[in-house]
Amino acid sequence: MKIAGILQELLGNTFMSIAEEMGAVLVKSAYSTNIKERKDCSCALFDAAGNTIAQAEHIPMHLGSMLGLIGEIKRHFKLEEIKPGDMFIANDPYNGGGTHLPDIAVASPVFYDGEIVAFVANIAHHNDVGGRVPGSNAADSDSIYAEGIRIPTVKIFREGELDKDILNLILLNCRVRHIRLGDLNAQFACNKKGVQRMEDVCAKYGQETVAPGM
């Protein structure tokens, strides 16, 4: 189905505004100066196939990392295993994570009428994820195992319920636990806002209009 150029432009700007709003939620909710002041973070929207729809004006290099996470989700989880309210987390550069271990990525599916219509994702640089030195940036490390905890692509939320065991496992391996928790909660809130906004767009225009607009 083709849509009119004006509607295409309207939807494109709507998607960009959603990504920017996600970024505002993340920056304003975060605990660490790395995210609040340096804005070492990014937010993006993807269609159901994992193609990029929009990325907020943060750090373009992060886009590849978020694309990797969406790809890992689609590779390692069957369609019927992904539910509304699920949220995925990863930081391992070799398994769908960021550009390095301190970059933690979080992605959520967007459902409408029982089907996945999009994904929202964000990535943020955490001050510390363990490893042999504070800050988790030992440039002379000869192994990734010295850099910090490796998080494969796993569900951190299952149908809207936080998996506290996985969260505690991550926090136990990080210095300054309360700041890590605050930043992770900001990332979770960011995605929830993105999912809500995308659902609103689908409800307003209908999925038969929104899908071609992506």
Describe every region a protein language model picked out:
Residues 43-47:
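Short hydrophobic alpha-helical segments used for membrane anchoring or interfacial signaling
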Residues 2-10, 150-214:
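N-terminal leader/propeptide and maturation segments of large enzyme subunits in energy/redox metabolism
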Residues 37-41, 102-105:
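Short, small/polar residue-rich loop motifs at catalytic or cofactor-binding pockets
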Residues 14-38, 74-78, 92-98:
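Short, basic/aromatic recognition patches
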Residues 60-73, 127-136:
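A short, polar/charged loop-to-alpha-helix boundary motif
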Residues 103-113, 121:
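A short, hydrophobic, proline-anchored segment that marks a local hinge/packing element in signaling
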Residues 48-55, 67-92:
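Regulatory sensory and allosteric helical modules in signal-transduction proteins
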